[in-house]
């Protein structure tokens, strides 16, 4: 009898041990899955949700849903992309298409800019904006790093030259597209200052740098809050090239930088 009892106790101990091991493994698996989800698949719907550990280190992926000014836009965060379920398990917002005039498209197709001798402003005014922006979505407010676009009309103050062209270019380039952003800091308005990149048929493009190259933004002049992700010299170089070749706003005889404009109008 004592031997049978010992066998039963031993069997029970083995079962308890197996149950404990299985429970620990299951708990560990759940905790690991939760940690991985938070790190790679958790959607951020507000800038304040971005963890401090992500700044200057991680890249976030998402869809541009609206462009409100020449140097900022709204991003719908889609972590993980297709692998994260977007497009089949989770849905990103759809944007309505803009009906562009056929004549404009044909004009650009058969009469290249260098033959039409367009003025600098007309180059940007002729760009098509493919989609209408959508507001009131759970998006991240993004401010482009390293640049200042010409100021649009605000509070009764006149718009700067090329402010509308900068807005058109940014909408043409970004709206409706999926981009990568690298958070760098938060500005005084609660926006995420970030480096923004997208893929084109010629390779990766830095949005801020492309604006400087096209002469529709200047290198950020502020003494505080300037973010270049250690690439300020590259921005300065391309601004000098754009100035020398009189691209965009540098084609003007007189130009007041956005920084000086904001100081003047207060």
Swiss-Prot record:
Q: Which GO terms describe its cellular component?
A: membrane; mitochondrion
Classification via SUPFAM superfamilies: Staphylococcal nuclease
UniProt GO MF annotations: endonuclease activity; metal ion binding
Q: Which SMART domains match?
A: SNc (SM00318)
Q: Which family would the database say this protein is a member of? A: Belongs to the LCL3 family.
The TNase-like domain extends over 58-252
Q: Which residues form the active site?
A: 143, 151, 191
As recorded in UniProt, its EC number(s) are 3.1.-.-
Q: Give residues annotated as binding Ca(2+).
A: 148
* Bilayer-crossing regions: 15-37
**Main location per the UniProt record:** mitochondrion
UniProt keywords (A-Z) are: Calcium, Endonuclease, Hydrolase, Membrane, Metal-binding, Mitochondrion, Nuclease, Transmembrane, Transmembrane helix
What membrane topology does this protein have? Single-pass membrane protein
One Pfam family name is: SNase
Give the protein's recorded name: Probable endonuclease LCL3
Where it sits in the cell: the answer is: Mitochondrion; Membrane
């Amino acid at each position: 009898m004592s031997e049978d009892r010992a066998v039963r106790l031993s069997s029970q101990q083995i079962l308890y041990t197996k149950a404990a091991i299985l429970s620990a493994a299951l708990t560990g698996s759940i905790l690991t899955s939760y940690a991985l989800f938070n790190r790679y698949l958790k959607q951020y719907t507000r800038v304040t949700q971005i963890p401090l550990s992500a700044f200057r280190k991680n890249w976030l992926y998402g869809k541009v849903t609206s462009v409100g000014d020449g140097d900022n836009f709204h991003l719908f965060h889609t972590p993980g992309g297709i692998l994260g379920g977007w497009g089949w398990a989770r849905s990103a917002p759809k944007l309505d298409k803009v009906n562009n005039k056929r004549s404009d498209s044909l004009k650009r197709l058969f009469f290249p800019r260098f033959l039409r001798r367009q003025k600098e402003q007309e180059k940007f005014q002729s760009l098509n904006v493919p989609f209408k922006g959508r507001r009131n979505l759970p998006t991240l407010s993004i401010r482009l790093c390293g640049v200042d676009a010409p100021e649009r009309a605000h509070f009764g103050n006149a718009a700067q030259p090329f402010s509308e062209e900068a807005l058109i270019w940014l909408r043409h380039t970004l709206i409706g597209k999926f981009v990568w952003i690298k958070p760098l800091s938060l500005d005084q308005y609660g926006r995420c200052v970030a480096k923004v990149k997208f893929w084109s048929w010629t390779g990766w493009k830095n949005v801020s740098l492309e604006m400087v190259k096209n002469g529709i933004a200047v290198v950020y002049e502020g003494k505080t809050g300037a973010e270049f992700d250690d690439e300020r010299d590259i921005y300065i170089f391309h601004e000098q090239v754009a100035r020398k070749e009189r691209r965009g706003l540098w084609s003007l005889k007189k130009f007041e930088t956005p920084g000086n404009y904001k100081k003047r109008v207060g």
